[in-house]
Design a protein with these regions (language model features):
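Short, Lys/Arg-enriched N-terminal segments with co-localized hydrophobic residues
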Residues: 1-20
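Short helix-onset patch at the extreme N-terminus, typifying the N->h transition
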Residues: 7-9, 26-29
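Positively charged n-region of N-terminal signal peptides that target proteins for export
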Residues: 21-25
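Bacterial N-terminal signal peptides
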Residues: 29-40
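Sec/Tat signal peptide C-region and signal peptidase I cleavage site
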Residues: 39-47
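Sequence context surrounding c-type heme c attachment/ligation sites in exported
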Residues: 46-78, 102-205
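N-terminal post-signal-peptidase region of extra-cytosolic proteins
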Residues: 83-101, 122-125
Length: 205
């Protein structure tokens, strides 16, 4: 005898009084559950980077939304392609002439530098070199009180693993070395102390 049970579209009532869900229904439920798990996995992966933090240093979450910041400039260094981005406070300061006018960047100014391994598009006209797999993302933030012992800036470097799609703090073996603080870029950037420790110029556009 065929009856309708709540939660199952069509079932067969067996002599033992059990409701056996049709095979097609089981398959549909299985597919839906698999899709839900995959969706949850993607969501978790997308959120993971915002939980990453350098011990006694910068947290990835301090730069939430950096992917949509305006471009300051692009560069190639050490065989990697990079794009340098700035938050509104950083861009406004550049537009006002900082640091060329001798004034420092304001507290709250932030920069992000995304590095990719280069990839040559051999089938495209001119065989252009374009970004391939991501390598890392580096951050700078101006906070003259918080980072008084490093020129008013805090630095953080986070390496990317394309296999697991996750970020982790760079290590002492990285370039620049990332210790348990926010000074990984300070030694290098002292070369441009007269530019408020910022190498990148705002490209004309």
């Amino acid at each position: 005898m065929t009856v309708s049970c709540r939660g199952a579209r069509a079932v067969n009532y067996s002599e033992r009084g059990r409701c056996t869900v049709r095979k097609s229904t089981l398959i549909s439920v299985s597919i839906l559950l698999s899709a839900a798990v995959l969706t949850a996995g993607v969501a978790i992966s997308a959120q993971d980077k915002y939980t990453v933090k350098v011990t006694n240093g910068l947290a990835f979450s301090e730069f939430r939304g950096y992917e949509r910041w305006p471009v300051i400039a692009i560069s190639e260094n050490g065989g990697q392609i990079a794009v340098i981005l700035g938050n509104p406070a950083m861009i406004d300061a550049y537009n006002e002439g900082v640091p060329g006018n001798g004034r420092p960047f304001p507290d709250g100014a932030k920069m992000a530098k995304i590095h990719w391994n280069p990839k040559k598009q051999e089938t495209y006209p001119g065989q252009p070199t374009v970004p391939g797999t991501q390598h890392d993302v580096d951050f700078m933030v101006k906070d003259s009180k918080r980072f008084a012992d490093s020129g008013g800036w805090g630095w953080g470097a986070f390496e990317y693993d394309p296999v697991s799609d996750t970020f982790s703090p760079a290590t002492e073996a990285a370039n620049p070395p990332q210790g348990h603080d926010a000074k990984c870029g300070f030694a290098c950037h002292t070369i441009v102390k007269n530019r408020d420790y910022v190498f990148t110029e705002y490209g004309k556009r």
